[in-house]
């Protein structure tokens, strides 16, 4: 019974207009208009009930699809889903790339919160194989918590104990490529170093150290 609000995109920079700061050309208002219509259809179809995980997933993927600057994609996603969520398991089965092309914007993985039995684990891997897309992948949430517990035993506090920098009881996730353990709403500090021909071990160490500091600092730049 809800109403869909109207929107005015007349002040959005027109398609093809130059971007002075980032370079490239503007995408124009059409992608944003497509997103609003896409989300509205899902909201209408789900009237009277909560959104399903797959519906939330599709909306977030559609948002990521339009987040571009100068024609360059500026988004990266991963969806961690429950073991018993069949719709997320089969999100990239069949001709999803024709019917739900926005799903290409996210990696999908099941999040194991406890060690599964062999049969359950093998069924998940068979589903991954049958999809021909390499997804849903597997993220071991239990292992992430165990790793955090080990990190808390690295730095002594001078009183016979250790400095507890992370709470091992937190529900940890990961960045879109699953290299980094993250808390809820925490930002990725992933950085990249360019190796030049003249680099040696010492110069590479310096680059990695600088990138680590910069990446950690940049991950805090949010309100």
List each model region and its residues.
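Function-dense linear segments that define catalytic or interfacial modules
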Residues: 1-21, 130-223
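Flexible, glycine/charged-enriched surface loops at secondary-structure junctions
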Residues: 2-8, 46-59, 67-79, 220-223
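Charged, amphipathic alpha-helical regulatory modules used
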Residues: 18-26, 55
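Short alpha-helix boundary/capping segments
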Residues: 23-31, 182
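Generic recognition of stable, solvent-exposed alpha-helical segments in well-folded globular domains
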Residues: 30, 34, 38, 54, ...
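Conserved, charged catalytic cores of large soluble enzymes
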Residues: 30, 34-43, 62-161
């Amino acid at each position: 019974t809800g109403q869909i609000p109207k929107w005015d995109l007349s002040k959005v920079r027109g398609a093809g207009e130059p971007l002075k700061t980032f370079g490239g050309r503007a995408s124009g208002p059409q992608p944003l208009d497509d997103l609003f219509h896409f989300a509205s259809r899902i909201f209408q179809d789900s009237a009277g009930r909560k959104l399903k995980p797959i519906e939330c997933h599709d909306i977030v993927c559609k948002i990521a699809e339009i987040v571009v600057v100068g024609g360059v994609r500026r988004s990266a996603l991963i969806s961690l889903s429950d073991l018993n969520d069949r719709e997320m398991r089969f999100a990239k089965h069949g001709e999803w790339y024709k019917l739900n092309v926005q799903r290409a914007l996210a990696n999908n993985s099941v999040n194991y919160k406890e060690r599964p039995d062999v049969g359950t684990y093998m069924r998940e891997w068979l589903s991954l194989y049958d999809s021909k897309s390499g997804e849903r992948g597997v993220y071991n949430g239990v292992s992430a918590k165990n790793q955090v517990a080990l990190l808390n035993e690295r730095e002594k506090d001078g009183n016979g104990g250790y400095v507890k920098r992370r709470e091992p009881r937190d529900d940890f996730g990961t960045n879109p490529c699953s290299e980094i353990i993250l808390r809820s709403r925490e930002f990725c500090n992933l950085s990249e170093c360019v190796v030049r021909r003249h680099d040696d071990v010492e110069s590479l160490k310096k680059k990695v150290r600088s990138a680590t500091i910069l990446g950690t600092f940049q991950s805090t730049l949010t309100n």
